[in-house]
Regions:
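Long, well-ordered core segments of solenoidal/helical folds
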Residues: 59, 105-127, 163-181, 189-195, ...
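Catalytic cores of carbohydrate-active enzymes
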Residues: 127, 218, 224-260
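A conserved hydrophobic secondary-structure block that centers on an alpha-helix together
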Residues: 38-41, 83-87, 94-99, 103-129, ...
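Active-site lining segments of carbohydrate-active enzymes
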Residues: 136-209, 218
């Protein structure tokens, strides 16, 4: 309650609705004005700026104005000099939204990566679908990885790159999590083997998503001069080839015997 009271006092110190309405409009105009489009078609402009607005609804600030936030370990932590973010539906957003943020919100991208690292320190792995500080484990892949790597390769922020890479590697090596151990052993995830974290059996999709994320880890490691790690993950990234069925020209699931 004390944190909420501080937030209210800091963000809305006066009882003046019209003032804050005007400030909110100005803030949104400033945000949406980061990209200017040209053309005479008003419908196209409405569609574009509506979509841009939607892209800015999440991730969301999760820390109080004094930096306090509730971590995945159920403890209160402090973000000193940065803002903690949550609401990361990374399977949905790593392809387009997060690359967009590197152009429209680079300072926030830095804080998002720091939020990932903090989550790893408190939970032992990077977030998959983080919502208000907790992990939902919805969707697949470890797609905090491409977000981190994109920021690193673009030279964004002052986050700890070594710690970020460590977090990526640790997450990619959780053998008991959603078929990762089988992915490493067989070069793909078999559809007929399930466990606590692999019960939904998205074996083909997981294999493809993991291979992409592994390629990203390899690229970051290479840039950091860690060629042994880069070689390991470049090799893993080729696992996508193991689910290509030349007989049908489709990517297809395989069982633990290798049969499509």
């Amino acid at each position: 309650m004390e944190g909420a009271a501080k937030n209210l006092q800091t963000e809305v110190p006066e009882n003046d609705f019209d003032k804050y309405l005007a400030e909110t409009k100005a803030n949104w105009n400033r945000q949406l004005g980061k990209i200017e489009i040209k053309g005479d078609n008003e419908n196209d402009k409405v569609n574009f700026y509506t979509a841009l607005y939607h892209s800015m609804i999440a991730p969301t600030i999760y820390s109080d104005v004094d930096g306090a936030y509730y971590g995945p370990d159920k403890k209160v932590h402090q973000a000193n000099g940065w803002v903690n973010y949550s609401t990361f539906s990374l399977w949905d957003t790593y392809r387009a939204a997060h690359p967009l943020f590197t152009y429209t919100e680079p300072e926030r991208v830095n804080d998002m990566v720091k939020s990932f690292i903090a989550f790893y320190e408190q939970n032992g792995r990077l977030p998959v679908w983080n919502f208000y500080g907790s992990e939902t484990d919805m969707m697949i892949g470890y797609h905090a990885v491409p977000v981190i790597v994109d920021a690193y390769l673009k030279g964004i922020g002052d986050f700890d790159a070594k710690k970020a890479l460590d977090a990526c590697i640790a997450t990619a090596n959780l053998d008991n999590y959603r078929g990762i151990g089988l992915y490493k052993e067989l070069g793909y995830i078999p559809y007929n083997v399930t466990d606590h974290y692999n019960a939904e059996n998205w074996s083909l999709s997981k294999t493809l998503e993991y291979a992409f994320d592994d390629y990203c880890i390899a690229e970051m490691a290479k840039k950091m001069g860690k060629q042994d790690i880069a070689d390991e993950f470049y090799k893993r990234s080729q696992n996508y080839k193991n689910v290509y069925n030349p007989a049908t020209s489709f990517m297809q699931p395989r069982d633990d015997k290798g049969i499509f």
